[in-house]
Amino acid sequence: MSQNQEFSKKEIYNLNKLQKRLRRNVGEAIADFNMIEDGDRIMVCLSGGKDSYTMLEILRNLQQSAPISFSLVAVNLDQKQPGFPEHILPEYLEKLGVEYKIVEENTYGIVKEKIPEGKTTCSLCSRLRRGILYRTATELGATKIALGHHRDDILQTLFLNMFYGGKMKGMPPKLMSDDGKHIVIRPLAYCREKDIQRFADAKAFPIIPCNLCGSQPNLQRQVIADMLRDWDKRYPGRIETMFSAMQNVVPSHLCDTNLFDFKGIKHGFEVINGGDLAFDREELPLQPAGWQPEDDENQLDELRLNVVEVK
């Protein structure tokens, strides 16, 4: 009995520690990008997946201790997919006492009519969903729309655009909609997917499957996700370093003439920030930038990496 109690205490301790980390990550993202302001009404898009459940839980937690006042309203879009468990989210949200709205729109029928069988429907589905959510935000008087994308999603999008789109473009933590009427925020931008997964498992959220529509998976995104997971396993700290790189862009050391006036460089031109690397080999830090060891793993030996050795 005492052993079970001790195990339970350890689980509670680990959960609290994990929740604090997620809170810290979300709090830092909110502060860095000014995501939430006093008096905001945040529409939390709740799909029934681990990410959106975690986002709602952490925002509710922060709401109790934040120095500013903001309200939350959870919104789920029931797209009339076969087998969608309509009762799960209302029961969960009523138990929490969270204001919510279930929007019923048969986007599934539209997508099935337009997209051939066996093809990926995610692109059309997301466009339809976006329009409905923008309209709902207006109806609810929401000042911000919160989506549950996390750090891994942002990195995957960066590599998708690099590998398949020829652009160095990721997924912004905060953006203005094309019509200029809605601000979209991603409070989980600094959160690791594996932390979210552990938190969701520990909290036993009533997860709704994401493949009810029968769409084929996005194979390109899956390839990128597998690649990043492999890197994270073989090279601890690489994911953190890559995300840190997205926050430390040096346009003068890239090749985009729209971002930097290379033609304007002449004798007497001021020194470019970042140094002269035309002849010198850049020294990299002993430890990957932004890397933090797992709570339950030993500190790895520090390795000095050379830029030509990074695979």
Curated annotation (Swiss-Prot):
<keyword id="KW-0460">Magnesium</keyword>
<dbReference type="InterPro" id="IPR011063">
    <property type="entry name" value="TilS/TtcA_N"/>
</dbReference>
<keyword id="KW-0820">tRNA-binding</keyword>
<keyword id="KW-0408">Iron</keyword>
<keyword id="KW-0547">Nucleotide-binding</keyword>
<feature type="binding site">
    <location>
        <position position="122"/>
    </location>
    <ligand>
        <name>[4Fe-4S] cluster</name>
    </ligand>
</feature>
<dbReference type="GO" id="GO:0005737">
    <property type="term" value="C:cytoplasm"/>
</dbReference>
<dbReference type="GO" id="GO:0005524">
    <property type="term" value="F:ATP binding"/>
</dbReference>
<dbReference type="InterPro" id="IPR035107">
    <property type="entry name" value="tRNA_thiolation_TtcA_Ctu1"/>
</dbReference>
<feature type="binding site">
    <location>
        <position position="213"/>
    </location>
    <ligand>
        <name>[4Fe-4S] cluster</name>
    </ligand>
</feature>
<comment type="pathway">
    <text>tRNA modification.</text>
</comment>
<comment type="similarity">
    <text>Belongs to the TtcA family.</text>
</comment>
<comment type="function">
    <text>Catalyzes the ATP-dependent 2-thiolation of cytidine in position 32 of tRNA, to form 2-thiocytidine (s(2)C32). The sulfur atoms are provided by the cysteine/cysteine desulfurase (IscS) system.</text>
</comment>
<keyword id="KW-0963">Cytoplasm</keyword>
<keyword id="KW-0479">Metal-binding</keyword>
<dbReference type="Pfam" id="PF01171">
    <property type="entry name" value="ATP_bind_3"/>
</dbReference>
<keyword id="KW-0819">tRNA processing</keyword>
<keyword id="KW-0411">Iron-sulfur</keyword>
<dbReference type="InterPro" id="IPR014729">
    <property type="entry name" value="Rossmann-like_a/b/a_fold"/>
</dbReference>
<comment type="subunit">
    <text>Homodimer.</text>
</comment>
<dbReference type="GO" id="GO:0034227">
    <property type="term" value="P:tRNA thio-modification"/>
</dbReference>
<keyword id="KW-0067">ATP-binding</keyword>
<feature type="short sequence motif" description="PP-loop motif">
    <location>
        <begin position="47"/>
        <end position="52"/>
    </location>
</feature>
<protein>
    <recommendedName>
        <fullName>tRNA-cytidine(32) 2-sulfurtransferase</fullName>
        <ecNumber>2.8.1.-</ecNumber>
    </recommendedName>
</protein>
<keyword id="KW-0004">4Fe-4S</keyword>
<dbReference type="InterPro" id="IPR012089">
    <property type="entry name" value="tRNA_Cyd_32_2_STrfase"/>
</dbReference>
<dbReference type="GO" id="GO:0000287">
    <property type="term" value="F:magnesium ion binding"/>
</dbReference>
<keyword id="KW-0808">Transferase</keyword>
<dbReference type="GO" id="GO:0000049">
    <property type="term" value="F:tRNA binding"/>
</dbReference>
<dbReference type="GO" id="GO:0051539">
    <property type="term" value="F:4 iron, 4 sulfur cluster binding"/>
</dbReference>
<dbReference type="GO" id="GO:0016783">
    <property type="term" value="F:sulfurtransferase activity"/>
</dbReference>
<keyword id="KW-0694">RNA-binding</keyword>
<feature type="binding site">
    <location>
        <position position="125"/>
    </location>
    <ligand>
        <name>[4Fe-4S] cluster</name>
    </ligand>
</feature>
